[in-house]
């Protein structure tokens, strides 16, 4: 594994890591949203994997988070607490448009924290598919 992607910035983070901060804040329309990423390059054929650590304003249990995620469009929860009970980018996510969420658990270091493992096929679920989905929403809600 190479512990950085893209060029280093003055603050010690890389451009890729800062893009994660800016894009997350843009999606949530909240420039005060705190994001602390570390991007690494792992030699795989394709696929994105993220260990996501979030802190919420109010405590949410892993069970409640799982229930919410199971209702989210385009998300598949694969979260069994056993070997193989989690998604990987090369097996489960390969050639699918879904984003898989696994290893949903409460953060033992922060009362209002959750930890998730998230994977997707970045060739399928990326800018191209997102553009199509945005166009479909625009046509459905604003043009048709």
Located regions from the model:
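Active-site-lining helix/loop region of Rossmann-like oxidoreductase modules
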Residues: 1-71
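Residues at the C-termini of beta-strands that transition into short coil/loop
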Residues: 5, 81, 105
